[in-house]
């Protein structure tokens, strides 16, 4: 069985998920919906991907420049089994009525409230909870990053305190900032902690800052342990955790710039670093407290989760079979 997949919103996340879908033997990319005929729409067409207008209201935009569309989102929904909604935050909830009317399963992204879906999802943490579901939310890039490493040590966790150092904008985003400031999120906790709790039931508090960079987020994590764990134990656990990589400052990984360069050296599409990067030297245990620092490529870490969510929703594979297939297809190192 090949699941027929549509994508609503072919931008930073949508185009990456579209690429990932095209690499799966059990999925077929049927088409993508766009609001305007920008360079991403033209590129999709060049790749042979059918392009639809996200609404009848947007059709004139395409007609004005002679961009031939296949139809509208409603037409696309008639041809797919599942729609991946990669529209800006808040739009997914508005779009849900369309998906329900069409009788199509849907995957939402982390910009939506948890209430939009039946389950919030990170594959290695709660794959089984998405089995057979109609509506699944893949949590945000930051929440995915936190969940991957914390889930690996969840049996040792008493309480987590984490600081999110967030990138200001994606590389192609000219509308967001700041450019010359550090912007704190003065609400405590930031939304990331409660979001982690929608996936794994742990005690966690988070704070967040936005800084003038585009490459990656960085998390400073402190964990109060409820039972003994050594630095060597943590290193071994992370070494054996899928979609988590250890990077060493000693080998030149001084910053997020080198992590992105590493992804470029792997010839990854859009220099995707699907894996969460933990600096090995930062892993430290002092008494009952564990510390570590990790980096999150906000443009790509959620991509494999979308693929695994599709398999779970259609019960195409069990957890580790799906993760293995996704990892292999995308060149994820482990």
UniProtKB/Swiss-Prot annotation:
A GO MF label: glyceraldehyde-3-phosphate dehydrogenase (NADP+) (phosphorylating) activity
Sites where the protein binds D-glyceraldehyde 3-phosphate: 140-142, 192-193
Active site (UniProt): 141
Keywords: Cytoplasm, Glycolysis, NAD, NADP, Oxidoreductase
Chemical reaction(s) catalysed: D-glyceraldehyde 3-phosphate + phosphate + NADP(+) = (2R)-3-phospho-glyceroyl phosphate + NADPH + H(+); D-glyceraldehyde 3-phosphate + phosphate + NAD(+) = (2R)-3-phospho-glyceroyl phosphate + NADH + H(+)
Locations listed in the record: Cytoplasm
Binding site for NAD(+): 12-13, 111, 167, 298
A single GO cellular-component term on record: cytoplasm
Alphabetized NCBIfam families for the sequence: GAPDH-II_archae (TIGR01546), PRK04207.1 (NF003251)
Similarity remark: Belongs to the glyceraldehyde-3-phosphate dehydrogenase family.
Subunit structure: Homotetramer.
Protein name: Glyceraldehyde-3-phosphate dehydrogenase
Annotated organism of origin: Thermococcus sibiricus (strain DSM 12597 / MM 739)
């Amino acid at each position: 069985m090949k699941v027929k997949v549509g994508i609503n919103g072919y931008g930073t996340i949508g185009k990456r998920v579209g690429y990932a879908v095209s690499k799966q033997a059990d999925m077929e990319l049927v088409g993508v919906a766009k609001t305007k005929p920008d360079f991403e729409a033209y590129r999709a067409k060049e790749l042979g991907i059918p392009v639809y207008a996200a609404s009848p209201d947007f059709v004139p935009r395409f007609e004005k420049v002679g961009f031939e569309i296949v139809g509208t989102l409603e037409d696309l929904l008639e041809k797919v089994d599942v729609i991946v909604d990669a529209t800006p935050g808040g739009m997914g909830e508005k779009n849900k009525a369309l998906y329900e009317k069409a009788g199509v399963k849907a995957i939402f992204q982390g910009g939506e409230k948890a209430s939009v879906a039946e389950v919030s999802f990170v594959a290695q943490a709660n794959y089984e909870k998405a089995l057979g579901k109609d509506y699944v939310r893949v949590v945000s890039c930051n929440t995915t990053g936190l969940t991957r490493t914390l889930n690996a040590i969840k049996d040792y966790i008493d309480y987590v305190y984490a600081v999110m150092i967030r990138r200001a904008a994606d590389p192609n985003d000219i509308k967001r900032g700041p450019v010359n400031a550090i912007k704190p999120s003065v609400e405590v906790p930031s939304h990331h902690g409660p979001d982690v709790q929608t996936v794994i039931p742990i005690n966690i508090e988070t704070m967040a800052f936005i800084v003038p960079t585009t490459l990656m987020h960085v998390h400073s994590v402190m964990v109060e342990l409820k039972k003994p764990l050594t630095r060597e134990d943590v290193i071994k656990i992370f070494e054996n955790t899928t979609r988590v990589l250890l990077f060493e400052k000693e080998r030149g990984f001084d910053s997020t710039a080198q992590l992105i360069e590493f992804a470029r050296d792997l010839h990854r599409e859009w220099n995707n670093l699907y894996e969460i990067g933990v600096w090995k030297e930062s892993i430290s245990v002092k008494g009952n407290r564990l510390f570590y620092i990790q980096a999150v490529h906000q443009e790509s870490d959620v991509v494999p989760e979308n693929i695994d969510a599709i398999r779970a929703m259609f019960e195409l594979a069990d957890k580790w079979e799906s993760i293995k297939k996704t990892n292999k297809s995308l060149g994820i190192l482990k």
